Amino acid sequence: MVIDDSNTIRRSAEIFLVQAGCQVVLAEDGFDALAKIADHQPSVIFCDIMMPRLDGYQTCSLIKKNARFKATPVIMLSSKDGLFDRAR
């Protein structure tokens, strides 16, 4: 699953992942992802940090609180490189 508010980033990630043989589910924000996650049960989730409405940290937290998806890897994507952001 790729969660990003940027259509360009979502589509680029989809192209690369499909070429690698992955099935890809796209979500435009955290709420969209939470609505789709139970139906698609992704094996890995790529999540942008900076999104409107529900940011990546909040989205990740909600995913991890669900026992069904607690072990699902969530890879956070960001252009931020500050120490605080890396530690978080």
Language model feature labels by segment:
Residues 66, 80-81:
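Short, conserved "switch-loop" micro-motifs in signal-transduction and mechanochemical regulators
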Residues 40-46:
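Active-site beta3 strand of CheY-like receiver
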Residues 27-31, 86:
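Conserved Asp/Asn-Gly motif in the active-site loop of CheY-like receiver
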Residues 51:
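Receiver (REC) domain active-site loop signature in two-component systems and cognate sites
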Residues 21-28, 36:
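Short hydrophobic/Thr-rich beta-strand motif most characteristic of the beta2 strand and flanking loop
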Residues 11-19:
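Charged docking surfaces used in two-component/phosphorelay signaling
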